[in-house]
Amino acid sequence: MNIFEELKARGLVFQTTDEEALVKALTEGQVSYYTGYDPTADSLHLGHLVAILTSRRLQLAGHKPYALVGGATGLIGDPSFKDAERILQTKETVLDWSQKIKEQLSCFLDFDNGENKAELVNNYDWFSQISFIDFLRDVGKHFTVNYMMSKDSVKKRIETGISYTEFAYQVMQGYDFYELNAKHNVTLQIGGSDQWGNMTAGTELLRKKADKTGHVMTVPLITDATGKKFGKSEGNAIWLDAKKTSPYEMYQFWLNVMDDDAVRFLKIFTFLSLDEIAAIEEQFNAARHERLAQKTLAREVVTLVHGEAAYQQALNITEQLFAGAIKNLSAAELKQGLSNVPNYQVQAEDSLNIVDMLVTAGISPSKRQAREDLQNGAIYLNGERLQDLDYSLSTADRIDNQLTVIRRGKKKYAVLTY
């Protein structure tokens, strides 16, 4: 199958401007294409990964990617389907975030090898060189207000109010396409389905200003089987930066994907062939309780984003915590694996008697309950059962001289830090 057919088979094509013409272009020669990433945070997240990996698939098929960091559009803010105006960031912040996003993109696209090696561009480079008057005369005149207001991405905001700044965003994104076409012969833009309105503004500008045809292809916004927006864990984004979301947290996210999503996500987020995925699906459906699809998904994506060593560490943390083998893990590994459990900073004046500490740290609700928990064998200190009511914590109980892990019952953990 050709690359477009593969993208479709993987569920990666949501909408195109002219499918027949796009398929013809992709099968007859090398296509230069771009995907834009606005620096709205200091890291990309899993939601961005769909477009990034789609871009990589096209590169592997011989086409040339341009990764556009929106240093200028990031200063404005995209209003698409947003309920309220974005908070404007400072130029210094956007510049810093732009650099970090550039570094992350370098992990996924090949910027070094072959005639189709990826190139990084920043739209601040051209927007900083064009005057407001020139922009209105040379670009703005090609867009009617009626056309701009008809976009689904802004209709909702028209009712509640939208600033001229954000209203002009689609014109800026449209100009990106024009600029990249003029300088690099870029003829295809790839983005999320929520970007359709902004992206087709680019094909409109190309047609009117340069009498050229541009293509747009959107990838779907991923939701889980319940319709919940993908890439969030308990309201928090799953970031690609290991400092913001540890490899262990990312591993757990994939491991806990619902059965009805697992195979679909293997097609979208991994480079396993469709035949390999079909074989995994057959095994998975025969014994879903073994969670083969989720385990494969976790392995492939964590390795892709963070590397083999990070995957092996995440796997080891998972296995050791499941076995209760706390002492087999370093303090750094425990901080990853127990990042979401209550943490108590031990104070100099705190009593180190275990009964007192269980209450002080909020592990047991009262001294009476703490004593009962100890006597009943429900308390574990660094993975080992403790029943001595007179036991006092010492430096010997500190893993790497940094922390102590206490468990009450099977699942209630607390971390003491010093």
Swiss-Prot record:
One Gene Ontology term from the biological process aspect of the record: tyrosyl-tRNA aminoacylation
Cross-referenced CDD domains: S4, TyrRS_core
GO annotations of cellular component type: cytosol
Residue intervals of the S4 RNA-binding domain: 352-418
Reactions catalysed: tRNA(Tyr) + L-tyrosine + ATP = L-tyrosyl-tRNA(Tyr) + AMP + diphosphate + H(+)
Keyword set includes Protein biosynthesis: yes
Residues annotated as signal peptide: none
Enzyme Commission number(s) of this protein: 6.1.1.1
Enzyme class of the recorded protein, top EC level: ligase
Motif ('KMSKS' region): 229-233
Binding site for L-tyrosine: Y34, Y169, Q173
Record key words, sorted: Aminoacyl-tRNA synthetase, ATP-binding, Cytoplasm, Ligase, Nucleotide-binding, Protein biosynthesis, RNA-binding
InterPro entries noted in UniProt: aa-tRNA-synth_I_CS, aa-tRNA-synth_Ic, Rossmann-like_a/b/a_fold, S4_RNA-bd_sf, SYY-like_C, Tyr-tRNA-ligase, Tyr-tRNA-ligase_bac-type, Tyr-tRNA-ligase_bac_1
SUPFAM superfamilies in alphabetical order: Alpha-L RNA-binding motif, Nucleotidylyl transferase
Subcellular location: Cytoplasm
Record: residues binding ATP: K232
Domain of life: Bacteria
Motif 'HIGH' region positions after renumbering to this chain: 39-48
Record has Cytoplasm as a keyword: yes
GO molecular function list: ATP binding; RNA binding; tyrosine-tRNA ligase activity
Gene3D superfamilies: HUPs (3.40.50.620), RNA-binding S4 domain (3.10.290.10), Tyrosyl-Transfer RNA Synthetase (1.10.240.10)
Function according to Swiss-Prot or TrEMBL: Catalyzes the attachment of tyrosine to tRNA(Tyr) in a two-step reaction: tyrosine is first activated by ATP to form Tyr-AMP and then transferred to the acceptor end of tRNA(Tyr).
Family: Belongs to the class-I aminoacyl-tRNA synthetase family. TyrS type 1 subfamily.
Assembly: Homodimer.
Protein's name according to its UniProt entry: Tyrosine--tRNA ligase
Taxonomic placement: Bacteria, Bacillati, Bacillota, Bacilli, Lactobacillales
Gene this protein is translated from: tyrS
